[in-house]
Regions:
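Sterically constrained small-residue positions within well-ordered secondary structures
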Residues: 32, 48, 64, 155-157, ...
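N-terminal juxtadomain amphipathic helix
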Residues: 37-69
Length: 422
């Protein structure tokens, strides 16, 4: 009786024959492309001291040998192979664009470059982890915003509601003293804030079970470490416009209380969007205010009752009751100095967000009152970029995060457009 193992062996034979035939077609096609590639260098001028050489190119079916022209570039002084420079990034370990894309996608979906190496070997195209890393670095460096279309494929239309949320997460980087002896640990590791954003159409939120929802399609923004708030704001503004911000029926920004985030909103988006303070973040500040107002009370009942009432009314009808309560506070009645200081700080916080707490109105329209989508995206980002043993260089992280964002947004193909058009 035949077993599943026998079937697997049969499948392997069929796959081997298919790859053999596909590799033959690849070799013929790539040779024609190499023969037709203009013999000009990176400076656009004809190459000198020309000769033919063997070029090894990795494809999804295996390695192909191609005879390609090689010549000396007058501007750079180095020998160039136009075929590889145009289509295969010019490296000694050349890959076709489709092979590059598969390796890049595998790198984004797996937890490490080592896992990418193992998975590539499993589907028949061995690539070492360092070569995958080099590819991602090179690919990320070639990504330019000018290559992207004016509008994303999932951009909001004139009847859509666009949701935008901003936040940040901590990334782990190699410090100035990375690699020094074990006893000198200070300065080995640096932690940097990675500013990020997620945007989506409200119509793309789907219920998957009672109390659980998911976002079908979304668009993310991630910037390298040490990016200034202003540079981050311009990046978010550009991507929000590509997501249809200027033509959407309504736009909502939902964020926690970080000062720099609301400065970004006030300067760049307040004229075209509604701002919402994350409800659960507001509740944390309400709890701090309750602690200050009821400081010294032995019975926790009044504090709990006051906090429950304020949270309920804030969520259902908005900030009116809370703001009236704050404005009626008898500051002299709070005898403890630290409690009075805390109460004033929290009161000022809520007064500054008076226009950002219409939770009842949001709920009536189906608009989220919390930034859970952003928290989820931060978790997903960290699941790839902050795993055990991962310590990034600034340059490597910047390149990879760009590739990762392009892949998540379904726009990885635009990383190839400039080189292919050369």
């Amino acid at each position: 009786m035949k077993t599943a193992m026998d079937m697997m062996k049969l499948e392997e034979k069929i796959r081997a024959k298919t790859c053999e035939y596909g590799l033959k077609l690849y070799a013929e096609s790539l040779q024609r492309v190499a023969d037709e590639t203009p013999r000009v260098g990176s400076d656009g001028k004809c190459l000198t001291q020309g000769r033919m050489q063997d070029a090894l190119v990795r494809t999804p079916y295996g390695t192909v040998h191609v005879r390609a022209f090689c010549g000396r570039c007058a501007a750079s002084g180095r020998f160039e192979v136009p075929f590889k420079e145009t289509y295969c990034r010019g490296s000694r370990f050349a890959m076709t664009p489709l092979m590059e894309r598969r390796v890049a996608v595998t790198t984004c979906e797996t937890g490490s470059f080592e896992k990418c190496e193992r998975l590539c070997a499993e589907w028949g195209c061995p690539v070492s982890d360092d070569k995958a890393m080099d590819l991602v670095r090179d690919l990320g460096g070639s990504c330019l915003d000018s290559d992207l279309p004016p509008l994303c494929k999932d951009a909001a239309g004139t009847e859509d509601v666009l949701i935008v949320s901003l936040d940040g997460w901590e990334g782990r980087f190699r410090g100035e003293r990375w690699g020094e002896k074990e006893e000198c640990r200070d300065g080995h590791v640096d932690w940097h804030d990675i500013k990020s954003a997620v945007m989506y159409r409200l119509s793309q939120v789907a219920d998957i079970s009672a109390g659980r929802r998911t976002i079908v399609t979304k668009h993310i923004v991630c910037v390298p470490p040490n990016t200034t708030p202003e540079a981050f704001a311009k990046k978010v503004e550009r991507e929000a416009e590509r997501m249809g911000m200027l033509r959407a029926a309504k736009v909502y920004f939902i964020m926690d209380g970080a000062t720099y985030l609301w400065n970004i909103f006030d300067v760049h988006f307040s004229s075209c969007a509604n701002g919402t303070l994350d409800y659960y973040h507001a509740v944390q500040h309400l709890a701090a205010l309750a602690d200050a107002l009821f400081a010294g009370e032995k019975d926790p009942g009044p504090r709990r009752e006051w906090l429950d009432r304020q949270c309920h009314e804030l969520k259902s009808i908005g900030p009116k009751t809370l703001l009236e309560t704050i404005r009626a506070i008898d500051w002299k009645g709070i005898r403890r100095r630290e409690a009075r200081k805390t109460a004033k700080r929290e009161a000022a916080y809520f007064l500054s967000h008076e226009d950002h707490m219409d939770y009842g109105g949001n709920a009536a329209l189906g608009v989220p009152i919390g930034s859970g989508a952003m928290e989820s995206q931060c978790s997903q980002n960290q699941n790839r970029f902050k795993r055990r043993g991962q310590f990034w260089s600034d340059e490597g992280f910047a390149a990879f995060i760009e590739v990762y964002a392009r892949y998540t947004n379904g726009e990885l193909k635009y990383c190839f457009s400039r080189r292919m058009a050369a």
